[in-house]
Regions:
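Amphipathic, Lys/Arg-enriched alpha-helical "gate/interface" segment within cytosolic domains
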Residues: 1-128
Length: 128
């Protein structure tokens, strides 16, 4: 499993990257699961926990950027903000490359620790 989705704190949703290397099957499952977060058509905030994430192949960077572009209207309508927990500076650079291909359509912030990301994401929901 490439990523686990924790909805126990919904509408605050935590996506934890497991450290498993991305492949065609698990990355497609990740993108489908990401889209399912919007199925309720309710306001949400996302926290991407990339503390265990591995480097992302450029092919999957492009797929992520395409997913953002394809779902831009859905994201803008329901997502109040996205916190990225990325302690690894190389992965932060890769995240920046994804956003150069397709800018993030909602407010976002990058954090080095999970607690700070959770607090910020919760505040985005409260601000709605």
């Amino acid at each position: 499993m490439y990523a686990k989705f924790d909805q126990t704190k919904a509408p605050l949703i935590i996506i934890e990257f497991t450290g498993e290397k991305a492949n065609a099957q698990n990355f497609a499952h990740y993108l489908r699961s990401l889209e399912e977060n919007y199925a309720r058509e309710e306001q949400i905030a996302l926290v991407f926990d990339a503390r265990k994430a591995l480097d992302l192949n450029p092919l999957y960077q492009m797929k992520q950027a395409h997913w953002l572009r394809k779902n831009k209207a859905l994201i803008e309508r329901y997502c109040q903000g996205v916190a990225y927990v990325v302690p690894n500076s190389f992965l932060r650079t890769m995240l920046g490359l994804v956003f150069k291909i397709q800018p993030n359509p909602v407010p976002f912030k990058v954090f080095e620790n999970l607690d700070a990301g959770l607090v910020w994401a919760a505040s985005q929901l409260e601000a709605q």
